[in-house]
Design a protein with these regions (language model features):
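Short, surface-exposed "cap/lid" segments of acyl-processing enzymes
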Residues: 31-85
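Conserved alpha/beta-hydrolase fold motif
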Residues: 123-124, 146
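Serine-hydrolase catalytic core
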Residues: 40-44, 192-268, 282-296, 302
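Glycine-rich "HGGG/HGxG" loop immediately N-terminal to the catalytic nucleophile
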Residues: 84-97
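Conserved acidic catalytic loop of the alpha/beta-hydrolase fold
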Residues: 104-121
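Gly/Ala-rich beta-loop-alpha elbow adjacent to hydrolase catalytic centers
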Residues: 124-133
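The alpha/beta-hydrolase serine catalytic core
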Residues: 4-31, 151-219, 263-287
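Alpha/beta-hydrolase-fold catalytic nucleophile elbow
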Residues: 149-150, 231
Length: 304
């Protein structure tokens, strides 16, 4: 069910046609304008294509600023919209329809399209999409560089010893709507105007389900991506850093697997979302150059 099904496009023209079709479908789907899938394209296949996948309840605009900088540096940049995200109605319950199968099929499609946009494929995701990046890194050998920012492998308030038990329990719970901040609700200052201020718990459960799946795969076989980097916020308030470290260890138990770590220091006192420009308390002018530098340094490193 969660086996990757690669079907790469043949060329740049086909890749652009696929993205155009995605955008047209989203335009009919009441998607907020800034949340429609973005493609910053040089008109031809470039050496590198960078896929930037927005976080849970956010939308492609989250990565727009970072994406433009990668584009100006010479890469094609693909910023897709995850299923059921970015709709004009911020209080929609559409996310209740999201499944782990939707996420893996979506991820496969992105990598397939990327083949026409760049000779080498880089994919980056944050939070829930960081979990998807982990699944892609586990299953797709055609990924050259995978970056997972604060991936959701567990929740910070759940002790590591109880993570697997918690994941199995939440799969059985009925769905209900949760605010990111129950005090401010729809007026949450940390939830920017194009992101959802809350979510159906069933959608969060599907990301946890995906985490369980990729963890089970990692116990059986090594990741297929060539280079993997985990980006960890040492002051992370939402996802479990302990589970991220455990997952890195799980991967590195396999022969010839090295997972790099990049840490944003605890002294920075960052919130969970370190990507969205305009988020209170996030020094974007400091964070973006570091993220760009990490990718640039790996891209320029001679192949072994």
């Amino acid at each position: 069910m969660f086996t990757s099904r690669a079907n790469p496009v043949a060329n740049h023209e086909e890749a652009v046609a696929c993205v155009t079709a995605m955008q047209a479908a989203e335009d009919q789907d009441l998607t907020r304008d800034v949340c429609i899938t973005k493609l910053y394209d040089h008109g031809k296949q470039t050496e590198h294509v960078i896929i930037l996948i927005h976080g849970f309840t956010n939308c492609p605009e989250q990565f727009s600023e970072l994406g433009k900088q990668h584009f100006e540096a010479g890469s094609n940049v693909f910023i897709p919209r995850m299923p059921y995200h970015g709709l004009s109605d911020r209080l929609t319950d559409a996310l209740v329809n999201l499944t782990a199968q939707d996420l893996t099929a979506f991820g496969d499609k992105l990598i397939d399209i990327a083949h026409g946009l760049g000779k080498k494929i880089t994919v980056m995701g944050v939070s829930g999409s960081g979990t998807l990046v982990a699944w892609l890194a586990q299953n797709r050998s055609d990924i050259d560089f995978a970056f997972a920012i604060a991936p959701l492998f567990g929740l910070a308030f759940v002790p590591p010893a109880f993570t697997k038990f918690f994941e199995r329990i939440v799969l059985l719970l009925p769905n209900f709507y949760m605010w990111w901040d129950p005090r401010t609700k729809a007026n949450n200052p940390y939830s920017i105007y194009y992101a959802y201020p809350g979510y159906p718990t069933r959608a969060l459960v599907e990301f946890l389900r995906l985490a369980m799946i990729v963890r089970a795969q990692a116990e059986k076989f090594p990741p297929k991506a060539r280079n993997i980097t985990m980006i960890i916020n040492d002051s992370e308030p939402a996802v479990s850093n302990a589970e991220i470290v455990k997952f890195i260890d799980l991967w590195q138990r396999h022969e010839n697997v090295t997972v790099s770590e990049v840490h944003f220091e605890k002294e920075m006192n960052l919130p969970h979302d370190i990507i969205t420009p305009g988020t209170p308390g996030v020094p974007i002018a400091e964070i973006q150059p570091r993220l760009i530098g990490v990718i640039r340094d790996l891209h320029s490193k001679p192949e072994s």
